Amino acid sequence: MSYRIDRQTYAETYGPTVGDRLRLADTDLIIEIEHDYTHYGDEVKFGGGKVIRDGMGQSPIANAEGAVDVVITNAVILDWWGVVKADVGIKDGKIYKIGKAGNPYTQEGVDIIIGPGTEAIAGEGMILTAGGIDAHIHFICPQQIATAIAAGITTMIGGGTGPATGTNATTCTPGPWNIYRMLQAADAFPVNLGFLGKGNSSQPQGLIEQVQAGVVGLKLHEDWGSTPNAIDTCLSVAEDYDIQVAIHTDTLNESGFVEDTIAAFKNRTIHAYHTEGAGGGHAPDIIKLCGQANVLPSSTNPTRPYTVNTLDEHLDMLMVCHHLDPSIPEDVAFAESRIRRETIAAEDILHDLGAFSIISSDSQAMGRVGESIIRTWQTAHKMKVQRGHLRDPQRPGVDHDNFRARRYVAKYTINPAITHGIAEYVGSVEVGKIADLCLWKPAFFGVKPELVIKGGVIAYAQMGDANASIPTPQPVHMQPMFASYGGCRTTTSVTFMSQAGIANNIPEQLGLQKTVLPVGHIRQLRKADLKLNDYLPHIEVDPETYEVRADGELLTCEPATVLPLAQRYFLF
């Protein structure tokens, strides 16, 4: 005889189901579960008197015979492809199945087998997302990595050698010797890492040797001279080796204007960093790049979202990061040319329209490495408050925020993965990918993950006093777990490398301990390949007023005076 349970009790026991809604932290964003892969009456849950016991929800099947290593039960998955409720099975460090977990001898429809070798993670009432990808890292200090993973970032791509003056300003690891040292250092960290070489050269040989040394891409930066010739040379090398090029264009327009830079691209794929321009780039109209089909445009988080404090803090940040002198008028003028309220306001709206595709940090170089996810959801919230409901083109009648949430989560997960040729391995909650996952309490969504799972093992978690009798006594804060230590660290994280570097046996020559995976399928990319963020507007910028128009429509919004995901979450 079946037993009926009211919706509230069901949600409290097994987590929300189809039709239930969750608020994302203290934002105004509301998501609704669209599908439930678990079976009513046959749900699995761990605990005393619960379902995952031998002969009930746990089978006698060994791992070698098909049982998974880890099961996450009854989680709400939020990813670019949808909002669903499911169990998630992890096997050999990868996502094995998204569906219904349990014991096939006692339950129907089981596609994730729980056995005596299966660990359980309770996902009831929790939100599961892919680990974040930050594709604009200045590797200024190793302490950034702990801050990033504690915030939910599991993959970091960028350049640098430490707090060198060049690294403070540019995301480049220049030359084979420096590249080798950073690749060796990567073994020490529980995140996936990939390094960008210096792309500024009018001749190819100095770029080719960096690609063959193992970088995942090349970075063109104006502080090294982003001239049309350097751009053309760098992209030509990238075409030969199937790697990405990231660019920070010429703010001062010394070697040409934005139209000259676009011409130098020759319709070849490129990742445009901080495409609005406050982080650097042709003043005042670098934002036009987001209308180019071959340009994969990103933002960095200090301008996310536009607030009453944004302009003031940017000037001081810029002076420090780019080695400028406040006593030199030309340096001050350079800084002021980059900070424009009109283009920053337009950037908010272009993100909401899906014209800007990626959000990253610009860590310690005008950006905060632990705030990319926070700033993404603050932008989504601000846009809902100011622009209202975002219509889902596939389901125009719904009144929840699933489409907006999917668009924004894609900006720091699948889209940077696609852009840098690693989407085969990471960037989404999909079968076959590395199990880099974040589990969030809805009240803390986007701010403080409850667990960060790296390659199927918990790497960071909210943990209380280690001397307490239970895990929860205060002070509770994010702490490294076992995937952050010893050999587990090198088996649950990877280093990304160019195909040329792997062919040159760089991993063996350097004695790298991490698995090394090749980047690829990059040079044919277009903005249309980026998920839910592929809008190509025609952008016009008034050179006198800096007003921005997209397809003829003026883009402007007010700065926020208060934001969610902010001080109330960091009182302790």
From Swiss-Prot:
Name of the featured protein: Urease subunit alpha
Main location: cytoplasm
Ligand binding (substrate): 221
N6-carboxylysine carried by residues: 219
Active site per the UniProt annotation: 322
Record carries keyword Chloroplast: no
Any single GO CC term annotated in Swiss-Prot or TrEMBL for this entry: cytoplasm
Coiled-coil region list: none
Catalytic reactions of this protein: urea + 2 H2O + H(+) = hydrogencarbonate + 2 NH4(+)
Species of provenance: Thermosynechococcus vestitus (strain NIES-2133 / IAM M-273 / BP-1)
Annotated EC: 3.5.1.5
UniProt-annotated binding residues for Ni(2+) 1: 136, 138, 219, 362
Family: Belongs to the metallo-dependent hydrolases superfamily. Urease alpha subunit family.
Co-factor(s): Ni cation
Keyword vocabulary terms for this entry: Cytoplasm, Hydrolase, Metal-binding, Nickel
Pathway the protein takes part in: Nitrogen metabolism; urea degradation; CO(2) and NH(3) from urea (urease route): step 1/1
Known partners and oligomeric status: Heterotrimer of UreA (gamma), UreB (beta) and UreC (alpha) subunits. Three heterotrimers associate to form the active enzyme.
Subcellular location: Cytoplasm
